[in-house]
Each structure stands twice: as C-alpha cells, then as structure tokens.
Swiss-Prot record:
It comes from Gloeobacter violaceus (strain ATCC 29082 / PCC 7421). HAMAP family: MurA. Residues 441-459 have a biased composition (Low complexity). It catalyses: phosphoenolpyruvate + UDP-N-acetyl-alpha-D-glucosamine = UDP-N-acetyl-3-O-(1-carboxyvinyl)-alpha-D-glucosamine + phosphate. Pathway: Cell wall biogenesis; peptidoglycan biosynthesis. The keyword Transport does not apply. This is UDP-N-acetylglucosamine 1-carboxyvinyltransferase.
Length: 459
C-alpha cells in the first residue's frame, strides 16, 4: 500500500464527558457562499521554513486552528517570536532561534512539528526532535526524512524516541524517495536550501502544498526548480532573507464543503479555490452526479444533478484522489444509488469512521483495506465519536443529511483542521451548534433552528 514500517501509532484518545460536542439537526438544504481558509498543511510547513532565515517573515491567510497554535508554541519554545498581527496574519521573527531541541509535551501532539528538524539542523548544525504525534491513522514513517538528511551529510540517530541530527555543514546530494512522501519531500527541500551545492529529489511529492512551500522558500531567496513535478532541484545558497507571503487556500476544506453540498443536494458557491488542486475530487463529484462549474475567478458552484450515483474511489498521492477526502466522500456515497468501493492505499488505518457512519444507518463493510459502501435511502441521527481529523468532517457531513439529531464528540480532532466550521455552516443555513456538557442543549436553539428562509427546504 505504499506504507513503510514504523513505530506503532497509539489509539486515539476517547472523548471525555467534559469535552464539547456538536449537535446537528439534519435533513435540510444549505444555501449561500462559503469562504475557504488558508491551507493548514501549507501554513505549518511555512512556519517551519521561516526558521531558515535570520530575518522576520509575515504570513497571510493562516487559519486559526489548534495545530497552528501548537506550532506557534513549539517555535516560541525554540526562542522564535511569533505574533498574530491581524485576523489571519502571523509575524515570525526567527532571529533569536537558539534552542536546538523541542519539548516532547508539545511535539507529541503535532506530527507536522517534525518539519522543524531540517531548518534547525541547517541553521544551528544540530537538532533534537522527539518523534511526533498527530492523528492515529496508521504508520507515517520518518525513515524517509532521515535517509534524506543523511544523503545531505547529516549524522542522524534515533534513540529513546528522540531523533538527533548533526552536521557541521550540509552538502547537496541526490535522493530517491521510495514513496513520494509530502513530509519527507518538504523536510529535505528545506534543509537543502542552505546546503552547499545542488540537491536532487527524485520521486518527490507533487502536492500543491509542496509547491507552496517551494514558492515561499523562493520568496526568501532559495533556488528551487521543479516543485510540482517528480524531480525537484535545489541549489543551496549561503543565506535566506525575510519574506511576506500569502498561504494558498485549503483544498481539503474546499472538498469538504463540496461534499456537504452534494450530500444535502444544495447549491453552494465556494471560494477562493484553485481548481487545478482539486482535479480528482471534481472528477469524482461529477461522476456521482453533481454539477460543478467555475462561476468566477477562484469561485466554484456545486449544485445537485438528477441523482447521486455510486462510484469507485482509490486514494493516491497527488494528482490522484487525496486520502484526506476519502472519509467525506464515503459519507456522500453512503446515500448514493448503488454500491461503491473505496480503496485506501495511503494510510492503512484510515477507515475508523466506518463504524460511526454505520451507527447513522450507513451500510458499509470493510475488507482488506477496502470499504464496500451500499447506498441507503437515508441516514438517521445518532450519537457518534470522531476518531481523527477527516473522520470528524465526514461525521459532520453525514449529520447534515441524517434525519433527526446527531451529536458528535471528539471535537479536538475537528478543531485541528477546520477553522470555524460550525459558524460557516450556520451561515449556510445548517442547524448546527457547539455545546458543553455542563450546559445541556435544548433540541436546537431557536436562533439556529429558524435558520435563513433559503435553508428551510428539507433534503
């Protein structure tokens, strides 16, 4: 499945009785326009890349998310100054980077924290980073990162859960990735910007977030070409300068709202988007019967066709269908006509949302990494628990279509990757609220239950 062996991942922590939860009154259409936030995965990599320079950087379109706050805390623990200066703008001053080791209690909860390894090594000549945490969705090995840094001349050892890398000066090298890992590609690319000589990464990841990182590094003076292709060439430079940069829109949030439109048979306008970042998602959505049109610069309109039909999906590295959209599309296929087969080839443990969707009335069976989805006429509201970030989004989408009340616990997963998702959905007419157990909810508050007139039509 393209997976390399790694240290075992821990099971997701169960939701606590004191945790907040979402309550959704489903079965109603949505209407309106939604604004897409900046890409979480790009933002995290760019924050790490800012460590490569000794001058201040300003990042625009950074989403307000738990993962962003955690990365900010990690950078601050290293002596870096991070300051929000506007709603979605961060100033990062890396001049005072002086600490080469990150605290375990911060790194353990954020897998993207591993991105700081390459920049710290390139700047300080040594880095000590605990093995990272994040969603428990299967093996996500760091050995590709390690081999890449070793090819640049670093001495790397993993001991007692700590990755320690040393290099008096990194040197360019030629690296072939056994798997086009986004994280490994980005780690090597960042470190190589300050290495002596030329570095070539073959079988590199082609995701838009890799291109965004390369563009940011270029804006700081790095010499990178080929990002977005299978071969990336980096010519090292002695130093990088500060930069002001806008993060790309989040293609996964875009796809999530497209799925919400499809499952509720609603017409939504979604932007800003780069359609080329979503080619596989758009193709599958059209196969299933949705009508998708570009109605303005960077704005897509999704509207219902005659029926929602079954289709088969196989997750693949970009430009294939993204694993981060698998769970959301499974929710849509659960109420489509016919039988679909979803093959998860990127992460071997990313079907944990299936039992929760079945609690809502879906008919899904898992066999050897494949999910067989038999479409049903309707879903019914029920209490469910999110097991990871994208599973939480899938449950929200299913809850929007399910008749009756759905409650979703485990919102710490959702808050890692979606900025103000319930407020965005409320603005589209969804009957959704966040509650604390200490204040038991009524069925649905009158303000939310009323909703805008345009959203009152049942699905």
């Amino acid at each position: 499945m393209g997976i390399e062996p790694s240290l075992p991942q821990s099971s997701p922590a169960p939701a606590k009785l004191t945790d907040p939860y979402l309550q959704i009154e489903g079965g109603y259409r949505l209407s309106g326009e939604v604004t897409i936030s900046g890409a979480k995965n790009s933002s995290l990599a760019l924050m790490a890349a800012s460590l490569l320079t000794m001058e201040p950087c300003r990042l625009h379109n950074v989403p307000k998310l738990a993962d962003i706050r955690m990365m900010s805390a990690i950078l601050e623990s290293l002596g870096v100054r991070v300051k929000p200066v506007a709603a979605n703008t961060l100033d990062i001053d890396p001049r005072f980077l002086s600490v080469h080791r990150a605290p375990y209690e911060l790194v353990n909860s954020l897998r993207a924290s591993f991105f700081i390894l390459g920049p710290i090594l390139a700047r300080l000549g040594m880095a000590r980073i605990p093995l990272p945490g994040g969603c428990a969705i299967g093996a996500r090995p760091v050995d590709l990162h390690v081999r890449g840094l070793q090819a640049l001349g670093a001495q790397v050892r993993i001991e007692h859960g700590i990755v320690e890398a040393r290099a008096r000066k990194l040197r360019g090298g030629r690296i072939y990735l056994d798997y086009p890992s986004v994280g490994a590609t980005e780690t090597i690319m960042m470190a190589a910007t300050l290495a002596e000589g030329e570095t070539v990464i073959e079988n590199a990841a082609q995701e838009p977030e890799v291109v965004d990182l390369a563009n940011f590094c270029r804006s700081m003076g790095a010499h990178i070409r080929g990002a977005g292709s299978k071969t990336i060439v980096i010519s090292g430079v002695p130093r990088l300068h500060g930069s002001e940069y806008h993060v790309i829109p989040d293609r996964i949030e875009t796809g999530t709202f497209m799925a919400a439109a499809a499952i509720t048979r609603s017409t939504l306008r979604i932007g800003p988007v780069f359609p080329e970042h979503l080619a596989a998602v758009l193709a599958k959505l059209r196969e299933m019967g949705s009508v998708v049109n570009l109605v303005g610069p960077g704005t897509l309109e999704v509207s219902p066709g005659r029926v929602m039909a079954a289709t088969d999906i196989e997750t693949l590295p970009f430009p294939g269908f993204p694993t981060d959209m698998q769970a959301q599309f499974m929710s849509v296929l659960a109420v489509s006509e016919g039988t679909s087969i979803i093959s998860e080839t990127v992460f071997e443990n990313r079907l944990m949302h299936v039992p929760e969707l079945n609690r809502l009335g879906a008919d899904i069976r898992v066999r050897s990494g494949h999910a067989i989805v038999r479409g049903v006429l309707k879903l019914s509201g029920a209490p469910v628990v999110a097991t990871d970030l994208r599973a939480s989004a899938a449950l929200v989408i299913a809850g929007l279509a399910a008749h009756g009340t759905t409650t979703i616990a485990g919102l710490h997963h959702l808050d890692r990757g979606y900025e103000s998702i319930e407020r965005k959905l409320q603005a589209l007419g969804a009957r959704i609220e966040r509650h604390l157990p200490s204040a038991p909810p009524s069925e649905v508050s009158s303000a939310v239950a009323a909703g805008p007139d345009a959203a009152a039509a049942p699905v």
